[in-house]
A protein has these predicted regions:
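Long, low-complexity, charge-rich intrinsically disordered regions
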Residues: 72, 89-92, 102-190
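A short, conserved structural fragment
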Residues: 36-47
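Helix-turn-helix/homeodomain-like alpha-helical modules used for DNA recognition
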Residues: 60-107
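Short alpha-helical "packing" element that flanks the helix-turn-helix/winged-helix DNA-binding module
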Residues: 1-4
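Short acidic, hydrophobic short linear motifs in intrinsically disordered regions
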Residues: 7-21
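Short, cationic-aromatic polyanion-contact patches
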Residues: 45-67, 110
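Short amphipathic alpha-helical interaction segments
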Residues: 22-37
Length: 190
């Protein structure tokens, strides 16, 4: 499912997933329902995939252009930062900053990352309630042009709790959550 998002941009349909699900002797709808129950993805009111972390089926403030030219949407800032490592590709992330609506650019090239403006930060927050990550956390994990604008946003959203992290911390979080998600373990040699 994640590879399909990365290859095409849009969310896969149940029909797109049927062949892969059949290899495990299950129907795609059953697999998708199980994944949603464990919060690996989120469904809309019609049972369609609206998110398969880190990807969003709908436009968000976190656009990611992959080296292939495919544009995808991430659920949040940390998800966006994890996509290049997860896919092993260069990418350009262009989120719209809350508060200022300024564009921030985070460029992944050959294992190096550049942030513009250099003062940009990520604010990691969540609501003090339970539910799917898409509803509880994703709306608060944002890029900001500076610590000052992150503080302004935090004051405007007291229902979230969290902190500001710098480039290194934010990239490490994205890598930790998604970096090895699509790698497969090699069997031990005898």
């Amino acid at each position: 499912m994640l590879r399909r998002f990365a290859a095409t941009g849009p969310s896969p349909t149940l029909e797109d997933l049927e062949a892969a699900a059949a290899t495990s002797g299950r129907a795609a709808a059953e697999v998708v329902a199980d994944l949603a129950a464990y919060d690996f993805l989120a469904l809309d009111d019609h049972g369609r995939i609206r998110a398969a972390y880190p990807f969003s089926a709908l436009p968000t403030a976190h656009q990611v252009r992959l080296a292939s030219g495919i544009e995808v949407w991430a659920m949040c800032a940390i998800d966006a930062l994890g996509i290049p490592d997860m896919l092993g590709t260069d990418a350009v992330i262009t989120p719209a900053a809350p508060v200022t609506s300024d564009t921030i650019t985070v460029t992944f090239t050959g294992g190096h990352t550049t942030w513009q403006p250099p003062t940009a930060v990520v604010y990691i927050r969540q609501r003090s309630c339970t539910g799917p990550a898409a509803d509880v956390a994703c709306g608060a994990l944002n890029f900001f042009t500076s610590r000052r604008t992150a503080r302004i946003w935090a004051r405007q959203h007291p229902d979230y709790t969290g902190k500001t992290v710098d480039h290194t911390q934010a990239e490490a979080l994205g890598r930790a959550v998604f970096g090895s998600l699509l790698t497969t373990a090699k069997p031990a040699e005898e």
